[in-house]
Amino acid sequence: MKIQTLLVAVFLPFAVAFAADPVTAISKNDKELQVLLKKQSLSKKDKEKVKGLLSDVFNFNLLAEKSLPKETWNGLDEAAKKQFASEFQRMVRNSSAKRLEMYRTDSTVYEAPKMKKNNTEANVTAHLWYRGKESVLVYKMNLVGDVWMAWDLVIDDLSTARNYKEQFSTILKTKTFAELLEIVKKKADENEE
């Protein structure tokens, strides 16, 4: 057991070092997204590509967990957690694909990542300019295997995870988790193309 612990302690830093830089993970994805958004209109295939790009960079399982009150999430069995995360992902992806204008930029500058927890968590700040107006985005990221994935996006000081958590907490004051899940499914269906 001590040998296994020692091997993990020795090799873990190397595994983290070989993972792509979190800024690279975000900027590569963003460049692909901007190429799509330069088109006058997006085909259904292009919109599916946008949804795929979101899935490539977002850890929807962690975002789903952080979007529910802790006691609610901890009270769910694994099947319910998986179902909620799946429907939540579908809702966010479909909603994002319908509001593509908010992702357009003329230029983007990324700050160096702020690393945390033995280089397994990072905050990446991006300054985006579109039509002369600047927005500041902070990607809260974690290392999943050897891939950097965002679990929260803070846009001009507004946290996506916190916003969903506040909405879902309000709903859960008067409705059951099953009813919340139906609301999420309905929203996902409404925004499906």
Which residues does each PLM region occupy?
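Low-complexity, intrinsically disordered terminal/linker segments enriched in charged
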Residues: 152-193
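Juxtamembrane/interface motifs at transmembrane-helix termini
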Residues: 65-71, 101-107, 170-172
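Early exported N-terminus immediately downstream of N-terminal targeting peptides
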Residues: 21-99
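Surface-exposed, charged secondary-structure patches
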Residues: 94-135, 187-193
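Sec-dependent signal peptide recognition
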Residues: 2-9
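Sec/Tat signal peptide C-region and signal peptidase I cleavage site
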Residues: 14-19
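Short beta-strand edge/turn micro-motifs at domain boundaries
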Residues: 136-162
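A mature extracytoplasmic/lumenal domain signature
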Residues: 88, 114, 128-130, 141-143, ...
